[in-house]
Design a protein with these regions (language model features):
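A short, flexible beta-alpha/helix-coil linker loop
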Residues: 141-143, 194, 338-342
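Acidic, Ala/Val/Gly-enriched low-complexity intrinsically disordered segments
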Residues: 2, 13, 19-32, 36-38
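S-adenosyl-L-methionine
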Residues: 41-62, 78-95, 179-225, 241, ...
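C-terminal catalytic and target-recognition region of SAM-dependent MTase-like enzymes
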Residues: 319-322, 326-409
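Conserved S-adenosyl-L-methionine
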Residues: 209-324, 347-348
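Non-catalytic nucleic-acid substrate-recognition regions in nucleic-acid-modifying enzymes
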Residues: 40-173
């Protein structure tokens, strides 16, 4: 069994659970045209928006609220139906998705020769460009084809020999093959770099929360942009910047490039028109972050400046005991305190959580609280009246949950 050539196959570095895409199987003849009609902007195909396990229903709500058709939560993400314009919009508009995959084809294969044959029928010419390098990532689970490297090689060879596109380990365009229970799903990663990389954040703290996760936690707390938000342990400012961008109706993908710009289906003029549609507004309130670390405050201010929302935010250095609500109506306090990863740390952190709870309970009447914690015991050390927590979500090698309150008395 031949193995992949060095530099062309990266292995199953990313694993996405497959769901059956829309589209016929096509024929072997006329490869360049045979399936092309399936992947045009006038046809619906399946689009998969990935998120962290546990956050699928929250992402589905966001996707549905932004007008995408047939949003459905599935393990690991959300599926929608649409064409290439919907792929572009999903990358540009959706805050909570980690990446956007276009489902190119789906078929059954029980051995490598069958995979090779079916891979040559995929409508590569309607998706990939012959002058743009690509790479392949593959994963196998519960299938008679079990060698992901050999499977990836078959896809790579099919693309090179039918389309002529070069393969490179550094390629921005990634073709993804998932074989599960002998069912093969072929997708193209249309995002490139993960979507939490908004394009503005150069400064981060030691344990950053990804912007995608922060936006979904804000949504879980009922935030829609119309109320103030305060983070008393703001780190590099992720919660506050996301809240300000939501309030200002700024597209999260406005400042970055995407892998779909290198695909055969890309229309630069249509994309430019889409980007030029203005939805921004001036928020009716401001967003506040504080942290005891002066370096964190400097990072937050720099990130807010690069994001273009510095005028809607305020960051100041201070301890938990110095936190007070800003003037105006109540809103949302959202905070991501230290988790205490090492043995013994959790006990040392209990006083911090108690102090946080005392400050919020005594000064923030009418405000709601969202607290991210890996240990229910630490969350409840605040003494705050939490509702049942959300499901555990993987984050930084741990599993964290969002603990929420209603308006504090």
């Amino acid at each position: 069994m031949a193995l992949p050539r060095p530099g062309c196959y990266w292995g199953p570095a990313l694993l996405f659970l497959s769901v059956s895409p829309v589209g016929s199987e096509g024929t072997a003849a006329k490869l360049a045209q045979g399936h092309a009609d399936e992947m045009t902007d006038n046809q619906n195909f399946e689009i998969f928006l990935a998120t962290l396990p546990g956050l699928e229903p929250v992402l589905r709500d966001e996707v549905g609220s932004k007008g995408f058709k047939q949003a459905r939560a599935v393990p690991g993400g959300v599926t929608i139906k649409g064409g290439w314009p919907e792929v572009w919009r999903a990358n540009l508009w959706v805050r909570g998705a980690g990446r956007v995959l276009a489902r190119v084809d789906s078929f059954r294969a029980v051995h490598l020769a069958q995979l090779d044959d079916r891979a040559r029928r995929v409508p590569w010419a309607s998706v990939l460009r012959p002058d743009i390098p690509f790479r392949v990532e593959a994963s196998c689970a519960g299938s008679r084809i079990y060698h992901s490297g050999a499977a990836a090689q078959r896809i790579e060879t099919a693309i090179r020999e039918t389309l002529g596109a070069p393969c490179s380990a550094e390629a921005e365009v990634t073709v993804m093959l998932r074989i599960e229970n002998d069912h093969c799903t072929v997708s193209v990663d249309t995002s490139g770099e993960p979507l939490h990389k908004r394009g503005y954040k150069e400064a981060i703290n030691a344990a950053p929360m990804r912007e995608t996760m922060a936006s979904l936690f804000l949504r879980q707390c009922g935030f829609d942009g119309g109320e103030p938000v305060l983070d008393p342990m703001c780190g590099s400012g992720t919660f506050i910047i996301e809240a300000a961008e939501i309030a200002a109706r700024l597209n999260p993908g406005r400042a970055r490039h995407f892998a779909f710009e290198k695909l055969a289906s890309f229309d630069p003029e249509a994309w430019q028109r889409m980007r030029e549609v203005k939805s921004a507004r001036i928020p009716a309130t401001r967003f506040h972050g504080s942290d005891r670390d002066a370096g964190a405050i400097a990072m937050s201010r720099a990130n807010a400046e690069r994001a273009g929302i510095a005028g809607y935010t305020e960051f100041r250095q201070g301890t938990i005991s110095e936190v007070h609500p800003p003037e105006g109506p109540p809103g949302l306090v959202i905070v991501n305190p230290p988790y205490g990863n090492r043995i013994g740390d959790k006990g040392k952190l209990a006083p911090l959580y108690r102090a946080l709870g005392q400050v919020l309970a005594s000064r923030f009447s009418g405000w709601r609280v969202g607290l991210v914690a890996s240990e229910p015991r630490l969350a409840h050390a605040t003494g705050l009246p939490f509702l049942p927590p959300g499901p555990p979500v993987p984050h930084g090698g741990l599993r964290v949950s969002l603990f929420r309150t209603g308006p504090l008395p």
